[in-house]
Amino acid sequence: MRLVLAGTPEVAVPALDALLASRHEVVAVLTRPDAAAGRGRKQVASPVALRAREAGLPLLQPEKPGGEEFLAALRELAPDACPVVAYGALVPRAALEVPRFGWLNLHFSLLPAWRGAAPVQRAVMNGDDVTGACVFQLEEGLDTGPVHASFAEPVGPTDTAGDLLSRLAVRGAGVLVEVLDAIEAGTAHAVPQPAEGVSLAPKITVEEARVDWAATATEIDRRVRGCTPEPGAWTTFRGERFKVGPVVPVPDPVPAGRIAVERKRVLVGTAQGSVVLGTVQPAGKKAMSATDWARGTRPQPGEEFS
């Protein structure tokens, strides 16, 4: 089949590679426009755009995928289907109606759980033992379409959102190809989502990524892992903001937010137990071990994170 892949971040690259290796023909790639990034605010292409250029594929980068210029280009490409992986913008009805088999979205949750932009992050922060991914038929509602295929993936006790996304992206790419094969063969069967079990996964805000030291050690661990690598869990010390890396819950009793520096570890108190702090990254600087940070900063007895 003729395909136009819609995707933007690194997590969508495995799907593009899998489609290029399949018997289907990727005739173009739809991705978000180049965006300013870094200290110099230079225009940077998305990971999918870079991979598409390497493969010599035509790129579509509209500000919104509903303009007449984009719709005309899509109609001219005449795709049979448009697979989607983390594209980053809503697709309007006019575009949904162009391919004869519609748009097939690889979503990183077991729908109807965690509909929205941050399903993996929300699953980790919620303490889910299992998550997964599914391929569903895109429609105008938010992740509401019928599901063609799905698979489960356990959430390990130290898994970050980034760890899970990497695994789901690779396995999901293969499932996406299988669904497209079934559609082409006429054997595909999509099942409507159940009305029960719906949960929403809006994008994680910067404020949500702030560590609440009045939470339990387990809750803080989940929040840090769910916000890794993006947007990054953070806290403040002496009025300065910085990111904190992996933490390990331990039973040691330390007052909430209090910093306890030991010879080989740095503890931070919580509402229940404490956490061993792994890394610290001050604004504009590289990440460093918590012990190195403590040696340089020298927290005084009784000082706290806030």
Swiss-Prot record:
Xref: CDD domains: FMT_core_Met-tRNA-FMT_N, Met_tRNA_FMT_C
Enzyme Commission number(s): 2.1.2.9
Highest taxon of source: Bacteria
Gene3D superfamilies, per database record: 3.40.50.12230
Key word Transferase present: yes
Alphabetized GO MF terms: methionyl-tRNA formyltransferase activity
Pfam families listed in its UniProt record: Formyl_trans_C, Formyl_trans_N
Residue ranges of the region described as Disordered: 287-306
Catalytic activity: L-methionyl-tRNA(fMet) + (6R)-10-formyltetrahydrofolate = N-formyl-L-methionyl-tRNA(fMet) + (6S)-5,6,7,8-tetrahydrofolate + H(+)
Keyword set, alphabetical order: Protein biosynthesis, Transferase
UniProt binding sites for (6S)-5,6,7,8-tetrahydrofolate: S109, L110, L111, P112
Gene Ontology annotations for the cellular component aspect, listed alphabetically: cytosol
InterPro entries assigned: Fmt (IPR005794), Formyl_trans_C (IPR005793), Formyl_transf_N (IPR002376), Formyl_transf_N_sf (IPR036477), Formyl_transferase-like_C_sf (IPR011034), Met-tRNA-FMT_C (IPR044135), Met-tRNA-FMT_N (IPR041711)
Family: Belongs to the Fmt family.
NCBIfam families: fmt (TIGR00460)
Known function: Attaches a formyl group to the free amino group of methionyl-tRNA(fMet). The formyl group appears to play a dual role in the initiator identity of N-formylmethionyl-tRNA by promoting its recognition by IF2 and preventing the misappropriation of this tRNA by the elongation apparatus.
Identification of the protein by name: Methionyl-tRNA formyltransferase
Source organism of this protein record: Kineococcus radiotolerans (strain ATCC BAA-149 / DSM 14245 / SRS30216)
